[in-house]
Amino acid sequence: MRRVNYAANRDRINAQKRAAYALRQKNRGKKVSITDIAIQKVPLVAPNGADHQTAFFIQETHKELLRFAQTQNNSNEVACLLDLTTGEKLDFVKGDQVSVDVEADAASYHWLRTRPPNSVMLCHNYPGQSYFSMNDIFVFMHYDAVRTMSIVTNQGKVWTISKTAEFDFAAAKESMSRAIAKSSGNKDRAIEIFLKECYNYGVERSE
């Protein structure tokens, strides 16, 4: 009887998981308007063991970014670069509902190219309920200055990926190539596979 119940419960749980995944996929990409409540509940995060002062600086930036997106960019995507070693912060860069191009912003691009390795954090919001994009991963991997990248969703949730001292660009690039091949070109699936293996090549993630 216990085995029967276990099998039934397992099937029920798996069905619930499939339904939840299907709902997430259905809702993915639909813009969520930013509310004051979402801004207030942005959590304190400390990527790569950041101290409290740095974590507070990151939290305040995430809140300011959402407020800027809410009031000045129709809840669309906005990005901002921080220098975690100096406490400097660049102006917000506006995007649209699906993307923001920090490389097209002169000041941001200059930082990406000239700041010391592992000194910069790139923060941006996602209007929909999506995760890191392929372009996010490209920018994160290819610019030595970028140590951490964060997504703060329009509902106030924060995800981060950070390079550790063991970051291996060649291994990470090879891992992404394998993930793309394994996923038959499905970018979302490739990113999921890639990030599941991220600790192998020196990337720390939090969610």
Enumerate the predicted regions with their spans.
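Contiguous alpha-helical segments
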Residues: 1-31
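Short HxH-centered metal-ligating active-site micro-motif
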Residues: 95-145
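Short, surface-exposed loop and linker segments with low hydrophobicity and enrichment for Pro/Ser/Thr
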Residues: 68-75, 139-147
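Residue-level detector of short, conserved catalytic/binding motifs and their immediate flanks
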Residues: 77-79, 120, 147
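Short, flexible beta-strand-to-coil junctions
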Residues: 82-86, 125-127, 143-144, 151-157
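Divalent-metal-activated hydrolytic enzyme cores
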Residues: 144-207
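Short active-site-adjacent helix-start/loop capping segments
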Residues: 89-90, 130-132, 159
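Glycine-rich short-loop/terminal segments
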Residues: 28-116, 180-207
